[in-house]
Amino acid sequence: MAKKAEIGGAGIWQVEEITQKKPLSAMTGDRDLIERLPKWLFPRFIDAESQVDIVSQSWILIVDGRVVVVDPCTGNGRDFPDFAPAHMLDTPYLERFAATGVRPEDVDFVFCTHLHMDHCGWNTMLRAGRYVPTFPNARYVMVQREFNRWDSRRPDHVPLAPNAGTFENSVLPVIEAGLADLVPDTFSITASLQIEPAPGHTIGHSMLHLAGESREAYFVGDAFHHPIEMIHPDLDSGTCESFALASQTRRRIIETCLTRNALVIPAHFPCAFGGALKLAEGELVFEPYDDPPATSLKA
């Protein structure tokens, strides 16, 4: 399924790869915390069986006359024996992408908030036994700090077993094709799109700031995996390289989006275009963005 909305004058398509269930207990075993969770989390974000939806999804932005893809998911047939949710997927992602009316060759820029397998996999696709760029006319914009973290050719490289092979299959072919732009922590892709640092989940993790005509939005990658981490930004579920930085980043994003009435669009939330953060009686509330209602296409 592909969904479309308009945010701040920019046309945005969401392209879903896959939705998978995860027990809430994998995020926290604190029973007191769970019992005190606000009602607005149920059932949209936590179901009756205490399961949460984790969505792998990308966005296509039409802004400033350019076509920009954000976080191109995992890819099919990738061997990740140490990370079952990404292992040997077989999804109609490219068909859903095509349903938007945007062709891979129409894409001007690809941006990955970080270089975990589920955020850069469709950078490439397998053709005649080798990985080649999926978006042949695009510039693949990657933050230099994040690129260095995963460059397996470096003598100081520290591997992470679940992410093994991602650099070689999803990043290096783009480098070899001459399509990569390695940029500083803060960088403008277009007049309305700026990369900003959001470290913690990975050391070079970034977010993409859409400065729309009437509203702003932040594509924040894995700064948050679930709204529970907005309510409890100090909750450590063990997925961050530097949790101290991750907690600081979460608090900064929350403050920024509250102050600016900006949408926050996390990579894995079960809402296609993120939502707004509000304060209700002093408590933080995340309201999914449903205005205007998103239109849907099925591949």
Regions found by a protein language model. Give the residues of each.
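Metallo-beta-lactamase
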Residues: 1-102, 106-118, 134-197, 214-221, 245-261
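Cap/insert and terminal regions of metallo-dependent hydrolase folds
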Residues: 84-91, 95, 213-299
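Metal-dependent catalytic neighborhoods of phosphoester/phosphodiester hydrolases
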Residues: 120-130, 276-277
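Active-site metal-binding loops of divalent metal-dependent hydrolases
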Residues: 17-18, 72-75, 115, 145-146, ...
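Active-site glycine- and acidic-residue-rich loops that bind
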Residues: 120-122, 194-206
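Short, P/G- and charge-enriched loop/turn segments at secondary-structure junctions
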Residues: 44-49, 128-129, 195
